[in-house]
């Protein structure tokens, strides 16, 4: 199944966090925090203004982004966990 985001929404795949501490202790999945960065998979057409114009999203597929810990809505597609997030919830693009 493929997802096509609507309006100013962006689909992001979370990037894996390091599962070991600097001293070599392995962190189990149940104790690890969800990462707050990811890769943009798909981008909606943009936000519609009151006068009907569409403001395009300032991101593209492949961009690495930072977002808030509680941003967006998690969905599972074909066993893969993705995040549907509004453009204004994305804090920065990693360059």
Swiss-Prot record:
InterPro entries: Chaperonin_GroES, Chaperonin_GroES_sf, Chaprnonin_Cpn10_CS, GroES-like_sf. Its main location: cytoplasm. The keyword rRNA-binding does not apply. PANTHER family: 10 KDA HEAT SHOCK PROTEIN, CO-CHAPERONIN GROES. NCBIfam families: PRK00364.1-2, PRK00364.1-5, PRK00364.2-2, PRK00364.2-4, PRK00364.2-5. Belongs to the GroES chaperonin family. This is Co-chaperonin GroES. It comes from Bordetella pertussis (strain Tohama I / ATCC BAA-589 / NCTC 13251). The lineage of its organism: Bacteria, Pseudomonadati, Pseudomonadota, Betaproteobacteria, Burkholderiales.
